[in-house]
Structures are given as C-alpha cells and as structure tokens.
C-alpha cells in the first residue's frame, strides 16, 4: 500500500519544514519538499496541512504486566494506548509472571506480542543469581538489554551475590539496565 502524507510540517534531523512523505508498505520511500501536492499513484492520501509529521516515540521502559499480572494491564490494551500517543516501539520489563529470565519465557513473550501488539516491541531479559549463562549468551539482536534488580521489586528478581554481579558485569555484551536501591 502506497500512502502520501502531504503538506505537513516535517520534523526531522533538528529542522522543521513543509514537506510530503511517501510511504510504501512500512517504508518511507521519498520526502518531497514544498507545499504542492505531489502527483502520483497512491492508495491512500493524508492531508497533514497544519499538522506535525515526525518520527514515532520509542518507549524503552514499560511494564505491560503480560503475562501473569493482566488485571493491571496487558500487551493489547497498553500497546493500543501507546499507538494513540505516538509511541511506535516499546521495550517491556521482565518482572512478570512468569519472569522473563529464560529463553523459553522470552520466546513466549515474542509469540504473544506477535498476536496482540499494535506497535513494534522488544523485551528485556532479566538477570537472576542463577541465569548468568542465559543472559550473557542471548542473541544481542533479539533484546535491547539485560534488566538487573539490585533491590527488591515486583517479581523478586534481586541479584545480590557479588560473584554473580562481577560475572555479569564482566561477560555482558548487552546494555545493563540496573534498578538500584540502597
């Protein structure tokens, strides 16, 4: 599907200018300067005159509580709300039930998100005192990082052993996102 978004105030690379954007499928294929409506064969045309056209937001720290705590929120409702607010991608935290601390739990979340999510997604894998080989061996293209709880929090994922912390800090090739207390 080829879409033309025309006449909007394009915000990109530190500048704002009136331009039109051509999107083919899910890829921006052209940016056309000026206020004239570009000619072409489009499946959909959006008049963005007077509106801002800008990149979507990436929310790198969400708690959608899915699976296991869905009385609070779930992937479908929260990703829908994210889309309405201009968030195009989210990274969900691992302190769910079950915790996302194994490759199997991570795979299950990806499979669930493929069915429920309205926007792009990824998931942090959580470190524990017992899963260092798993989190340091995870494919870095699958997850944005490793969540490390250094204080008690939802899900009781506290990593409190000095030997484990040393090994994690030494071996991790992914960014560590630490929840620090004390």
Model segments located where?
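Metal-associated gating/positioning segment near the N- to mid-region
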Residues: 51-116
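Divalent metal-coordination and catalytic microenvironments
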Residues: 8, 21, 26, 50, ...
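Receiver (REC) domain switch-region micro-motif
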Residues: 45, 58, 146
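Histidine/acidic-residue-rich, glycine-tolerant segments that coordinate divalent metal ions
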Residues: 96-107, 111-182
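Alpha-helix termination/capping residues and helix-transition junctions
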Residues: 2, 15, 39, 84, ...
